[in-house]
């Protein structure tokens, strides 16, 4: 199970919500091992407003905050998941502006995933039409069974 999926399951939350964000971007920041392509920088990815799952970046939180605040706002929810799905897992619910201080308080220096997005806030959203009782698709015909005789 990928860390982002395991972490979302532990949080018991959806990563997409109608009219808030319908896209999840899995990414990381540049590190010692390799740089990131310019077109995949957080400054560019952040323009989408998508839910972000940022791996391998706990030591780059200053950059994460600086790159994303113009697009998401300093009060945007951020969740740090240390050692997702492990017995010693820790979850820190904070904001873009507060995440560095919280991570320092908890002494987290590695093995953490950073989620950023409005889907994690106290938001009101319209339920997806996909689950509406009157929404018909190939696997659901809104309770109207076809008669075999009519075929």
Describe each PLM feature range.
Residues 1-31:
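Short glycine-cluster motifs
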Residues 21-23, 27-151:
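A contiguous loop/helix-start segment that scaffolds small-molecule binding in enzyme catalytic cores
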């Amino acid at each position: 199970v990928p860390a982002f999926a395991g972490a979302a399951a532990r949080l018991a939350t959806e990563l997409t919500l109608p009219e808030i964000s319908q896209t999840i971007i899995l990414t990381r920041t540049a590190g010692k091992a390799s740089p990131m392509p310019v077109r995949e920088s957080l400054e560019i990815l952040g323009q989408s407003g998508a839910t972000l799952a940022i791996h391998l970046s706990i030591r780059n939180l200053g950059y994460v905050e600086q790159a994303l605040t113009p697009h998401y706002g300093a009060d945007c929810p951020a969740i740090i998941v240390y050692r997702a799905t492990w017995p010693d897992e820790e979850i820190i619910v904070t904001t873009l502006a507060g995440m560095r201080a919280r991570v320092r308080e908890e002494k987290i220096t590695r093995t953490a995933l950073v989620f950023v997005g409005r889907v994690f806030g106290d938001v009101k959203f319209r339920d997806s039409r996909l689950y509406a009782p009157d929404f018909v698709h190939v696997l659901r015909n809104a309770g109207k069974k076809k008669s075999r005789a009519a075929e």
